[in-house]
Amino acid sequence: MTTAPISSDEIDIVHVSKHYAQRGAPLAVLDDITLRVRPGEFVSVVGASGCGKSTLLRLIAGLDADYRGTIRVAGEPVRDTSLERGIVFQDHRLFPWLTASQNIHAALRNAPLSAKEKRAAVAEHIALVGLNGFENAYPHELSGGMAQRVAIARGLVNRPRVLLLDEPFGALDALTRGRLQNELQRIWEHERITMILVTHDVDEALYLGDRVVTMAPRPGRIERIVDVALPRPRERSDPRFIRLRDAVLADFAEPGIASAEHDEPPHGGLPARPAQQPVTAWRLAR
């Protein structure tokens, strides 16, 4: 059987395994991960604590080269960090002594741009994330959501092929998280770059992703991949969305709970849900 050729900007992860040393013995963190991400695709990776999803993101970013298997971006093996792979973490990691603009500008230190081009790129990305008027604000003067917008702008300012997002909204309140999910979707539609989001929030994964990769823990492995063939913008109250959410949650159900929560409803309807169930109820335990 022949393997399909890798297209431009495609991410190809083949038989990747990762171990850490624990008390002198190897601890398996990832086991035989194989995944191909298409150019411009938004892929969500969801799983509970210990499934290795953040470790996988670090490997793709080039922050850790100690693993078995291969990771290629646009046909080139990932050996180190690169301006072509931006990353955003759960904590914004802004320099507290720099303003919003200066934090974004700092990411351009190694970019082959003139000073004028760098200033223009910073201004463009300040506008892209909706922070006009806050260019000179310091991190302590920004809300958590605004600080994450700066972090996203910093991750995008080098115009990477891929943006990696490691639970970027996990520390935010539900309302701010919802707003930034919409903002991230708008940015993705505008930029049309590949995005890989790691999250433990099933709703977030389905709301944003073209595909959702579910991971099982210890060692981390891909449980299955779900295509999210729903139009954008998506509605969480859409019966199709709810069915997909239930299907994904079934992968994480504890024995004895799944049958009670997923009993077949009468007349082929949807399983009953408590009224006004908050989105946070569908976030997996850390």
Stretches with model-predicted labels:
Residues A61:
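Helix-to-loop junction immediately C-terminal to a conserved catalytic motif
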Residues K116-F134, R186:
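Conserved ABC ATPase "signature" region
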Residues L98-A106:
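Short coil-to-helix segment of the ABC ATPase nucleotide-binding domain corresponding to the Q-loop/switch region
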Residues V88, I152:
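Hydrophobic anchor residue at the start of the ABC signature
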Residues V46-A48:
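The feature captures the beta-strand-to-loop junction immediately N-terminal to the Walker
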Residues R68-T81:
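Conserved ABC transporter NBD signature motif
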Residues A137-H140, N158:
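Conserved signature/switch motifs of ABC ATPase nucleotide-binding domains
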